[in-house]
Amino acid sequence: MIVNRYKDAGVDVNAGYELVRRIKGAVASTKRPGYVGNIGGFGGLFDLDSLGYDHPVLVSGTDGVGTKLIIAQKMDKNDTVGIDVVAMCVNDVLAQGAEPLFFLDYIACGHNDPALLASVVQGVAEGCKQAGASLIGGETAEMPDMYAPDEYDLAGFTVGVAEKDRLLSVDTPQAGDVLLGLASSGVHSNGFSLVRKILFKDHDVKLTDKPAELKGKSVGESLLAPTRIYIKSVLPLIKQGLVHGVAHITGGGLIENVPRMFNDGLRAEIAAGSWEVPDIFNYLKQVGNLSDDDCWQTFNMGLGMILAVPADKKEEAKQLLLASGEKVFEVGHLSERTDGEKIFIKLVE
């Protein structure tokens, strides 16, 4: 009777059990060395000693997918946003030099649809496999009246580890370091409030539209391209000492994120035009009548991650990145910052 009254109030406990049943296989597929236990416990367990680190430092990160979820829900395509939430978290800990160990997800919804939410979690599991992290726990909160029945929100949390002497700090990059840009898959998971305003409020663009600028792809397909996860291509370079700094290009674009990887004594000189800008950005710029500053300060503009590498190691780093499947561009370098200069990034045409 208690369960029935709870269901009458909008929370279906049995739907929660069904969701757990549906995702068990996906969760199990993410197991890695160090994972302890099984799904369903009160807490996720991980054995750090099993990894053989000498002086391990734990690095944590948390993030969400933002209003990209609105696009996914309108398109009824929910199987890739899980990759996005993992990417947003693990790429951040990678920027500190850390290997992601495990991940936990949090889903809040107005109505627990086990089939729909299972597809979300399957995306999370896929992201975890791309990152080499175990999905060791999570929470699904059914909150009627807080969310509409067809709405959900998605966030995540990751913990990584690095040897203390391999951590990347703002003091590691040096003047003369070369900046290597790694191609993004598109908009990734930032700037979607501006995207939605441009396309759906200022203009009557349909997600199914296929403008010529997108070369056969629909607007929705282009926007939902999952955020690229750079762990397996970049982490080996960090462990080999080939990388001085990493910038994950998220909210704030190149302007805000590149300076986060070096100290105030340096500036980054980036040559605009030295990499391929995906069609979606040119389309958004045109439709939204955006200035260059709007674009640089909001979007990744085709670079999901930027690495600072020693000049004498750049070719070795490039070849390793190319071999791992990355598109790599030499986009600039670090130089000494003159006294009083406030501009960290100089965009050179």
From Swiss-Prot:
Family: Belongs to the AIR synthase family.
Catalysed reactions, as listed in the record: 2-formamido-N(1)-(5-O-phospho-beta-D-ribosyl)acetamidine + ATP = 5-amino-1-(5-phospho-beta-D-ribosyl)imidazole + ADP + phosphate + H(+)
Lineage: Bacteria, Bacillati, Bacillota, Bacilli, Lactobacillales
Gene: purM
Principal localisation: cytoplasm
Record flagged with keyword Nucleus: no
Key words of the record: ATP-binding, Cytoplasm, Ligase, Nucleotide-binding, Purine biosynthesis
Signal peptide region: none
Localization (cell): Cytoplasm
Gene Ontology biological process: 'de novo' IMP biosynthetic process; adenine biosynthetic process
EC number(s) stated in the UniProt entry for this protein: 6.3.3.1
Name of protein: Phosphoribosylformylglycinamidine cyclo-ligase
GO terms assigned for molecular function: ATP binding; phosphoribosylamine-glycine ligase activity; phosphoribosylformylglycinamidine cyclo-ligase activity
Biological or metabolic pathway of the protein: Purine metabolism; IMP biosynthesis via de novo pathway; 5-amino-1-(5-phospho-D-ribosyl)imidazole from N(2)-formyl-N(1)-(5-phospho-D-ribosyl)glycinamide: step 2/2
Entries under Pfam families matching the protein: AIRS (PF00586), AIRS_C (PF02769)
Provenance organism: Lactobacillus delbrueckii subsp. bulgaricus (strain ATCC BAA-365 / Lb-18)
GO CC terms: cytosol
